[in-house]
């Protein structure tokens, strides 16, 4: 049997990237992270860089805007995982061009890690970001690059500390805002589990040219259920303030960045139901907890305990 794939990360020091890099190294993959000199010398990244070094991660000097450095880095590996942030999504075409030239990549994971962008009903500004991700998918497919798209839905560490309250610094004390009627199911995943599931998919033929949906059964919940679970844990009832879609849309239009971004993403999930309003067909996707039943994921019930 062939050894484990060598993996190159672009955006590996970012929010979700660091969890996937760690999962890669811990799973025994030769793990490479493309970094600029400025990242290595950035004091805010020192601790993370040291942690990566302790895992045996190799840093490769390069830049998304330096074609030669990209091609050189890509030629050392089998798999490329992009976890670049919102501002760099469109510039992944540069990465795709380098992958195409290098000619050796067995799998490319573009920066997704959210909704399935081909199955959304979004309004601006979320719509623009989703459209960019969808355009990147089409370029990958047109170039014939083998791929896996990872749909993770909500990051638990982002959305659960404040019970998915837009813009709130912590959990609600007396009142809780619920977008829509509160009975639409959404998905929340722990970042470490996202890392584990993503790395499991790297060498798996079942995820080749497919979407990997991370939708474990105990991580699918409505806002009403989430609030009830929180009330049970804290022993304190909250007044529920329901915001109809018309008002949600108005709030999005009136809000500034980043509040409007967060609200528009929550709108797709909690009002439109875009996490759970379609069936996963074998022709285009697989569900992570079904294909990797041995992964012990953290259910929402357990994740919430750390915020009580």
From Swiss-Prot:
CDD domains: PCBER_SDR_a (cd05259). Pfam families: NmrA. Keywords: Cytoplasm, NADP, Oxidoreductase. PANTHER family: PHENYLCOUMARAN BENZYLIC ETHER REDUCTASE 1, PINORESINOL REDUCTASE-RELATED. Its main location: cytoplasm. InterPro entries: NAD(P)-bd_dom_sf, NmrA-like, NmrA-type/Isoflavone_red_sf, PCBER-like. It is an enzyme of class 1 (oxidoreductase). GO terms for cellular component: cytoplasm. GO terms for molecular function: oxidoreductase activity. NADP(+) binds at residues 11-17, 36, 45, 137. The active site is at residue 133. Belongs to the NmrA-type oxidoreductase family. Isoflavone reductase subfamily. This is Isoflavone reductase homolog. Its EC number is 1.3.1.-.
């Amino acid at each position: 049997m062939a050894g484990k794939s060598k993996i190159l990360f672009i955006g590996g020091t970012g929010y979700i990237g660091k969890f996937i890099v760690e999962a890669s190294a811990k799973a025994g993959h030769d793990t490479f992270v493309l970094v600029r000199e400025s990242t290595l010398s950035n004091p805010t990244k020192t601790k993370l860089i040291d942690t990566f070094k302790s895992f045996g991660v190799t840093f490769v000097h390069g830049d998304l805007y330096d074609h030669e450095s990209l091609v050189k880095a890509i030629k050392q590996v089998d798999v490329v995982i992009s976890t670049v942030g919102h501002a760099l999504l469109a510039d992944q075409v540069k990465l795709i061009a380098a992958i195409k030239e290098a000619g050796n990549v067995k799998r490319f994971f573009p920066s997704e890690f959210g909704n399935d962008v081909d199955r959304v009903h979004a309004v601006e500004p979320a719509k623009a970001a989703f459209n960019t991700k969808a355009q990147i998918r089409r370029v990958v497919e047109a170039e014939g690059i083998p791929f896996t798209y990872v749909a993770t839905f909500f990051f638990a560490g982002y959305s659960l500390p404040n019970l998915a309250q837009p813009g709130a610094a912590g959990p609600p004390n007396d009142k809780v805002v619920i977008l829509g009627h509160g009975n639409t199911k959404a998905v929340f995943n722990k970042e470490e589990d996202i890392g584990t599931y993503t790395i499991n998919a790297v060498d798996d033929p079942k995820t080749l040219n497919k979407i990997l949906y991370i939708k474990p059964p105990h991580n699918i919940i409505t806002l009403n259920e989430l609030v009830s679970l929180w009330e049970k844990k804290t022993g304190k009832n909250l007044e529920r303030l329901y915001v109809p879609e018309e008002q949600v849309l108005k709030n999005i239009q009136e809000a500034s960045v980043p509040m409007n971004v967060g609200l528009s993403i929550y709108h797709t999930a909690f009002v439109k139901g875009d996490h759970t309003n379609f069936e996963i067909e074998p022709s285009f996707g697989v569900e992570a907890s079904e294909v990797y039943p041995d992964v012990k994921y953290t259910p929402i019930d357990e994740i919430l305990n750390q915020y009580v």
